Amino acid sequence: MQSMEALMPRDSHLETLQTVLDGLMRRYQARVPDVARVLQAMTAAGLIGHAGAVENDHIAFRTMGVPHLGIASLERIFLHYGYTRHDRYNFATKKLTAYWYRPPQVHFPRIFISELRVPELSPQAQSIITSYTDEVQQDPVDDLDLDDGHAVDAFLHQPLWRTPTWDDYQTLLRESEFAAWVIYNRYYLNHFTVTVHNLPAPYNTIASFNEFLVAHGFTLNDAGGTIKVSADGNLIQSSLVAQMVPATFADGHGGTIEQRIAGSYIEFAERRVLPDFRDLPPDQLGREHRRDGFDAGNADGIFESTYTHQTRKQEV
């Protein structure tokens, strides 16, 4: 006998997924003013007809590798909607592990989830992190109705642990800027990605689109170069420096303190046509004909969009 899961219409999962993605993007755009500015510039230049016409290559989340959380927990949400996991990436210096997830249909974005390998940090950093994450006593996805898109959206934006203190945030920042970002932002969407290769020429390459961004006053992340190219040359990426956002921390004495920290950012991706399909007419090219997946070298630099040595450039 088939399970209720197997009998559930596929469309219901996809509708729920769309609700979740819409919720993520709505809150992300409200917190990242650069999104509206970029989309307005693209619309004014005729690159897209309207803001909703932009093609989202992928979205990304950051997680802590601790019991009940991390990739093993968060991925369950998207696997439920038909995403499939691919390719493990290791970032030795940053102490990160990541996977990417292929969507159930090509109009949905890919997903990239990274996880901090907490046991590799110093005892002090581990102690700070677990003092918060130990408040999570079981996998929170266990109690989540994955068929309720609004509930999933709310979960992805709710606190998983108490508000961190400013002192703890600063201590983590000195050792792992990734850790500091996650201890405050939790599952908040880290970035979304504009698909560049389907834009009108000449703006359909990262090189030309970066020039467009700079001309409109945006600050590019130059960690690893402003243009990041995969080892095979077929995935070209860039990103903006994360904007600084207001954040409320605990002051350690029962009150709160307001600070400005790195928020989320925007990425841009150009996926070149694979050699076997380069004779296809442009109007016949689909996602399946282009370079898929990710590149560890590119991603290593893009992570630093939220790092202090990048964000301080906006203050100059």
Regions found by a protein language model. Give the residues of each.
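Extended, well-ordered protein cores
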Residues: 3-75, 80-316
